[in-house]
Amino acid sequence: METTGIVRRRTAERVRDALERLVTERDVWVATAHPDHGPHQVPLWFLWDGHAVWMCTGATSVTARNVRKEPRVRLALPDTFDVLLVQGEAECFPDQEVPGGAAQEFAEKFGWDPRVEEGSFLYLRVVPRTVRAWRGEPELRGRVIMRDGMWLEQRPSLADAPLSDHDPQPEHLNS
């Protein structure tokens, strides 16, 4: 993998970039597992509502069956260089019982409303517990940007902060 010229982003920038991608992107790979049948992965459309990822799948799909048995999932946006992985537990909502405006926002984003289709669909809501983001080898260190459902923020250290005419110089630099 070519990593020459990659500048390692700070945590706050990674969080900003991750949130932007969650708002603007359309597709996510959803990895589930069944205790008896093993792992399963499928691409789905998704909606980020500011707190959770919403997806929709057939009510009898392998994905739906898996999350009913084992709700832990991993989501991955489909860029292998600008990696974004989300881990959480999927909550299941029948298509006519989706809380809030999530189903309507989903329909507006994609021009498709599963609630009016023949057959039954299941909405999956995943509130992130862990998020990892990195671009190439230089960003592997520090790739966790959310832990236990809380976004991490990097506090700038004195060594990282630019000195200006308005900032007092540390005493050891004035000698």
Across the structure, where does each feature detected by a protein language model lie?
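Alpha-helix boundary recognition
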Residues: 20-24, 68-69, 107
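A generic local structural motif
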Residues: 14-17, 41-42, 60-62, 111
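Short beta-strand segments
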Residues: 25-59, 65-67, 73-78, 85-87
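Short, basic/aromatic recognition patches
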Residues: 2-29
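Short beta-turn/strand-loop junction motif enriched in small, turn-promoting residues
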Residues: 33-35, 72, 111-112, 131
